[in-house]
């Protein structure tokens, strides 16, 4: 029996060694296993993957034919999920390739605008429902990361040639040109991804936070929770805090998160402004501009900007910016004037209609003042819609890399503004709760103070009446009669009838004040 077992093992090994050099195109190979039953040995063939060891000894031919598959990585479910992702990716990139024109008639938009619209629409579908200060659901978060990676993968293939050195085997150094991701994408895409992760982490930090909560707007509690800040935002649920307000650690945490989100918003705003400034101004926008800056700004605004002394803060304080429409109109006018002045600075044709009598130095000064106003407007009104110049640049832009940077930074800026607004809603509600608590305490303290004052006043009046009725309560002054004289004479002071005040000169008054004269001369 032992000899037969050894012969079977040697035959199995030689057979497997021969099968290693057979056709390599198949991913599965046939292996043999020795099975001993009732003292007899026989060879059983089974199909196993290449990675499985052919010399493994198993106890049953059924177990040898079944591969070990984890329930978490079942091929059926995994292939279905991958197939669904593949179909979704094909659909997205087909729309991008066709320029959102599914008819294929060539009437679609440019690739840059199609990609910009795809990123904007994705952010609207993911973050448009973020009405509460709470973490994003896991399915939406996973969808955002997956689909934004698909859209950003286009920038991996936008490259530029840079010089590099290559050393051969014999030690000779040769200078060659290699491809690298374009400079602006290489610097800004990782930064924007970091800002994206910071915003999602900020929302995750509010997981399990139970010191503030949201109620339905139509409920009785929601009607009571309305305030001046949330009256116009009918789509947002009112926020509630405890009667005494938030605890000090929670309040500090909210202020810390607000500062972090503010930094994210400023960084995204800076990247967006830089990308927009590098985009070319379309000719259609230039053709729609008036001849000079005065016609664009109006006489009053132009006079304020071109004065010798100019303060941008005071300039904005004098204007009516009560509505969003008025602020946007002011921004459009100032941007148009900046474009006009820049074109006049760079134009060489002095006889054209762009020429004017204003010197180049003054025009540069006016341009700097107008750009300062634009920066202040962007800081004071971060949620302001895009201006006419920005919309025109995005619409006619042909650079795919700039389109991705502009849209990605814009949606991150918008998301940061949304998160900061939700934090400010909670802090405003907390401030109202604190004011109500302090007002209630002052009211209760005022009632106690009034009761104490009335009691003390009553005791003093009773004491005076007791002194009047008690003859033994008189003092020595009462017996001497000094109180009567002082009370009679205290009403009107006695005056000497014929005494006239001495008139002093200015020098004498000065000497009296400074004490230069002797005490004898002063009288």
From Swiss-Prot:
Compartments, record wording: Cell membrane
Annotated keywords = Cell membrane, Guanine-nucleotide releasing factor, Membrane
- A GO CC term attached to the entry: plasma membrane
**Ranges where the PRONE domain occurs:** 76-440
Among Pfam families, the record links this protein to: PRONE
Can you list the disulfide-bonded cysteine pairs?
A: none
Region labeled Disordered — which residues?
A: 44-83, 442-523
Q: One GO molecular function term?
A: guanyl-nucleotide exchange factor activity
Xref: PROSITE patterns: PRONE (PS51334)
Q: Where is the composition biased (Basic and acidic residues)?
A: 465-475
- Biased composition range(s): Polar residues: 44-57
What outcome is documented for mutating residue 161 to A in this protein?
A: Decreases GEF activity 25-fold
Q: In which tissues is it expressed?
A: Expressed in pollen grains and pollen tubes.
InterPro entries this protein is in? Answer: PRONE_dom (IPR005512), RopGEF (IPR038937)
- Subunit comment: Homodimer. The homodimer interacts with ARAC5/ROP4. Interacts with ARAC11/ROP1 and ARAC10/ROP11. Interacts with PRK6.
Q: What is known of its domains?
A: The PRONE (plant-specific Rop nucleotide exchanger) domain is responsible for the GEF activity.
What protein is this chain from?
Answer: Rho guanine nucleotide exchange factor 8
Quote the gene name from the UniProt entry: ROPGEF8
């Amino acid at each position: 029996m032992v000899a037969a077992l050894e012969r079977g093992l040697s035959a199995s090994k030689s057979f497997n060694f021969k099968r290693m050099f057979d056709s390599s195109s198949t991913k599965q190979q046939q292996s043999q296993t020795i099975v001993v039953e009732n003292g007899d040995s026989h060879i059983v063939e089974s199909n196993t993957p290449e990675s499985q060891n052919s010399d493994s000894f198993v106890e049953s031919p059924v177990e040898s034919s079944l591969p070990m598959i984890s329930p978490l990585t079942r091929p059926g479910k995994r292939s279905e999920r991958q197939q669904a992702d593949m179909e979704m990716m094909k659909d997205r990139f087909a729309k991008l390739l066709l320029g959102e024109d599914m008819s294929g008639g060539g009437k679609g938009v440019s690739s840059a605008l199609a990609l910009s619209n795809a990123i904007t629409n994705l952010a609207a579908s993911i973050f448009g429902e973020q009405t509460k200060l709470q973490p994003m659901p896991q399915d939406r978060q996973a969808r955002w990361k997956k689909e934004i990676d698909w859209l950003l993968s286009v920038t991996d293939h936008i490259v530029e040639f840079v010089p590099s050195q290559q050393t051969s085997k014999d030690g000779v150094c040769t200078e060659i040109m290699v491809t690298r991701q374009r400079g602006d994408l290489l610097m800004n895409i990782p930064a924007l991804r970091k800002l994206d992760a910071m915003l999602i982490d900020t929302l995750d930090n509010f997981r399990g936070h139970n010191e503030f909560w949201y109620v339905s707007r139509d409920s009785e509690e929601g009607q009571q929770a309305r305030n001046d800040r949330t009256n116009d935002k009918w789509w947002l649920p009112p926020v509630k805090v405890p009667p005494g307000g938030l605890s000090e650690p929670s309040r500090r945490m909210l202020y810390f998160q607000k500062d972090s989100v503010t930094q994210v918003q400023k960084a995204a705003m800076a990247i967006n402004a830089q990308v927009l400034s590098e985009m070319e101004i379309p000719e259609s926008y230039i053709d729609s501009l008036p001849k000079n800056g005065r016609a664009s700004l109006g006489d009053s605004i132009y006079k304020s900007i071109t004065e010798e002394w100019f303060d941008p803060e005071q300039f904005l304080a004098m204007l009516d910016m009560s509505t969003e429409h008025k602020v946007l109109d002011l921004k459009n006018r100032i941007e148009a004037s900046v474009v006009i002045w820049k074109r006049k600075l760079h134009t060489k044709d002095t006889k054209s209609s762009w020429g004017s009598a204003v010197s180049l130095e003054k025009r540069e000064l006016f341009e700097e003042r107008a750009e300062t106003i634009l920066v202040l407007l962007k800081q004071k009104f971060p949620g302001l819609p895009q201006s006419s110049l920005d919309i025109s640049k995005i619409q006619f832009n042909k650079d795919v890399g700039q389109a991705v940077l502009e849209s990605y930074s814009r949606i991150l800026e918008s998301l940061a503004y949304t998160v900061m607004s939700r934090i400010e809603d909670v802090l405003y509600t907390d401030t109202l709760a604190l004011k109500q608590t302090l007002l209630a305490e002052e009211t209760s303290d005022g009632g106690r103070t009034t009761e104490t004052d009335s009691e003390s006043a009553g005791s003093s009046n009773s004491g005076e009446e007791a002194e009047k009725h008690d003859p033994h309560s008189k003092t020595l002054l009462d017996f001497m009669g000094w109180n009567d004289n002082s009370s009679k004479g205290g009403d009107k002071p006695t005056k000497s009838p014929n005494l006239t005040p001495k008139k002093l000169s200015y020098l004498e008054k000065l000497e009296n004040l400074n004490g230069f004269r002797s005490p004898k001369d002063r009288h």
